């Protein structure tokens, strides 16, 4: 989300519309204006289902994936935090936090296989990080506690990272069969909740930067968002 694109209009009645993650975050007028962060499979995990036949795609992850991106006064990204609450996936289950900052990438969780899979195959390919440097993630083994509530917000902490979101502005459903990651189209459905307030602490210090808010009163958008009831198929 350092520079942004405008997405195609997309909603439940047009599930095949192409989706741009970055445009989703920025555009509140379209249902896709959500800042979606979720896990999707790399090409190697997509199975034999053709990109053009969503009916043959199989679930690869079920869970929740809130996200937070902060910006400085010039609009540059100062931090990107991807919180994962994975109920089931092809690489296991558990809670993970992936933190991107200009000085490197930190992954926190109890299962390095799951944490590094999420970081290397998915987060690094998200358009939010287009044009930003990506380094080999540093894995920090630690329990991650996640409390997500579509009524009130999020608290996630572990491995020196503490993320809070509050003031849920909206709750809306989203679905598409055309969400590309690493050159492979995926199907995605979820419930999205943009948040009006958020902050991140890293090793006890408040992470610099502010969230970006936009959209319309009917469809607000924010770079701090909840994403629940999330299912990815590939």
Sequence positions of predicted segments:
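N-terminal signal peptide c-region/cleavage motif recognized by signal peptidases
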Residues: 40-41
């Amino acid at each position: 989300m350092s520079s942004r694109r405008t997405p195609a209009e997309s909603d439940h009645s047009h599930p095949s519309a192409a989706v741009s993650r970055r445009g989703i975050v920025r555009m509140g007028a379209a249902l896709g204006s959500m800042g979606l962060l979720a896990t999707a499979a790399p090409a190697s995990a997509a199975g034999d289902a053709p990109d053009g036949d969503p009916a043959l795609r199989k679930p690869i992850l079920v869970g929740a994936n809130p996200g937070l991106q902060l910006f400085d006064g010039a609009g540059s990204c100062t931090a990107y935090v991807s919180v994962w609450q994975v109920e089931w996936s092809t690489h296991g289950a558990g809670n993970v936090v992936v933190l991107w900052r200009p000085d490197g990438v930190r992954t926190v969780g109890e299962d390095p296989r799951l944490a590094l899979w999420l970081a290397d195959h998915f987060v690094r390919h998200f358009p939010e990080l287009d044009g930003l440097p990506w380094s080999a993630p540093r894995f920090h083994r630690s329990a991650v506690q996640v409390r997500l509530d579509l009524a009130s917000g999020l608290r996630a902490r572990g491995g020196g990272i503490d993320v809070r979101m509050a003031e849920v502005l909206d709750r809306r459903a989203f679905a598409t069969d055309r969400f590309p990651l690493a050159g492979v189209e995926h199907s995605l459905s979820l419930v999205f909740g943009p948040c009006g307030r958020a902050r991140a602490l890293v090793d006890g210090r408040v992470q610099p930067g502010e969230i970006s808010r936009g959209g319309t009163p009917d469809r607000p958008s924010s770079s701090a968002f909840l994403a629940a009831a999330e299912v990815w198929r590939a």
